[in-house]
Structure formats: C-alpha cells, structure tokens
Regions:
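Non-heme Fe(II)/2-oxoglutarate
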Residues: 1-72, 80, 89
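Catalytic core of non-heme Fe(II) oxygenases with the double-stranded beta-helix
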Residues: 81-148
Length: 153
C-alpha cells in the first residue's frame, strides 16, 4: 500500500485584477540582490483601501478555511507590488514570521519556481532524476491568477 506523507498544500485561484486599480501606485525602487523594481519599502499599507483588504481576505479564506488551514486570528501583514521586465528575476527566498503568502499575477504569466524544502536530502540520497521526488514546482499561471502557499516555500 502506497501512502503519501508530508504533503505541502498550495492553492490556485482567480482574482479580479481590476479591483487593484484603486491602490495608489507607490514609488518603485530596485530591491534585493536581483534589483527587481518593487514597492516593498515604499508601499504605505494604510493607503490600501479597506475594500481591497476585504476582497483579498475573502479569496484567501475561501481557500484556506475550507481546507481547515486558516487560524482564528488571521491577518495580513504587508502587501507590495513587484514589476518584472523580460529578464528580471527574484532570488529564492522565504517570507519569515508569517504562515501563508500569495502572489497575484496581474499582467504577466507565472515564472515562479518553488523549491522542495527537502531538496538537499533528496539530491543527496536519490540524485535529481526521480519524478516521485520533484525538486521544484513551476506553476503555469496566467494573468488574473493567485497562488497561495506556505511562507516557508
């Protein structure tokens, strides 16, 4: 009998990106090692309308709550916008001190890659060629898509 253990749930959903048009555009600055343009340091959270917080809460809740993964005191921390040009990239990273994160693809298709948290052990014991032990996950998401994932990915 085969049994799967240590599964990592992620969620794909659709959002109405036109709702985000009401968010004031914060200045974009080069960030992180990649220099991708971002409002990470300049986006004032208080400028994000309550309607957006409510909309995003609803999308997250309909995914996490039905899977019994949403805590009783859930709250959003920080929202920002990254703008990618053709050859821009984002280094592998996590979102510390948070449980769940998400990416919304407003006008680009996904080039996001998630690395298996056990990648080092898998490579050490099995190499890189067993499809039963994938080393990464590259979702195929279009504009208007949202992916919700544990922040340790």
């Amino acid at each position: 009998m085969k049994q799967e253990i240590f599964g990592i749930p992620i969620f794909h959903d659709q959002v109405d990106v036109t709702k985000f048009d009401c968010i004031p555009l914060a200045p974009l600055e080069p960030t992180w090692d990649s220099g991708v343009m971002s409002s990470f340091s300049s986006q004032k959270q208080e400028e994000i309308p309550e309607s957006i917080w409510g909309y995003l809460s609803g999308v997250v809740e309909r995914n996490l709550y039905s899977a019994q993964l949403m805590g009783k005191n859930a709250r959003f921390g920080h929202i920002w916008r990254n703008v990618y040009k053709k050859h821009d990239y984002q280094d592998a990273h996590i979102h510390p001190k948070s449980q769940w994160s998400y990416v919304i693809y407003v006008d680009v298709t996904s080039r996001t890659a998630f690395f298996n948290p056990s990648i080092h052990n898998i490579q050490n014991h099995f190499g890189c060629t067993l499809p039963q032990f994938p080393l990464d996950y590259k979702p195929n998401l279009e504009p208007g898509s949202m992916i919700i994932f544990p922040s340790f990915l």
